[in-house]
Amino acid sequence: MNMFIVMMINIILSMSLIIIAFWLPQLNLYTEKANPYECGFDPMSSARLPFSMKFFLVAITFLLFDLEIALLLPLPWAIQIPNIKITMLTAFILVTVLALGLAYEWMQKGLEWTE
């Protein structure tokens, strides 16, 4: 019963936040919000400059390996559970998939800046 109340509160809170997030932007629609802020001066050039795709690939790779660290950090505590084989197999599969993805990106020359 107590778990049901907690789940209902979480669902109601989540749904109310989603509804508010969709409802608030529709209150004040005008074009000034869509333009970049330029401190009152006319923009010298376009404010939306394209960015390097190589930088994007390196940033995504960094995020993936940062996520790997976050997932593997509690591994010493997870080893203390009785069924250690499943925990170690899951960690090994995660590291293997990420290593294969890194090797593929390296083979495709996605990590090289000179081209």
Swiss-Prot record:
The chain crosses the membrane at residues 4-24, 55-75, 86-106. GO terms for cellular component: mitochondrial inner membrane; NADH dehydrogenase complex. It is an enzyme of class 7 (translocase). Gene3D superfamilies: NADH:ubiquinone/plastoquinone oxidoreductase, chain 3. Its EC number is 7.1.1.2. Keywords: Electron transport, Membrane, Mitochondrion, Mitochondrion inner membrane, NAD, Respiratory chain, Translocase, Transmembrane, Transmembrane helix, Transport, Ubiquinone. The keyword Ubl conjugation does not apply. It is a multi-pass membrane protein. One of its GO terms (molecular function) is NADH dehydrogenase (ubiquinone) activity. GO terms for biological process: mitochondrial electron transport, NADH to ubiquinone. PANTHER family: NADH-UBIQUINONE OXIDOREDUCTASE CHAIN 3. Belongs to the complex I subunit 3 family. Core subunit of the mitochondrial membrane respiratory chain NADH dehydrogenase (Complex I) which catalyzes electron transfer from NADH through the respiratory chain, using ubiquinone as an electron acceptor. Essential for the catalytic activity of complex I. This is NADH-ubiquinone oxidoreductase chain 3. The gene is MT-ND3.
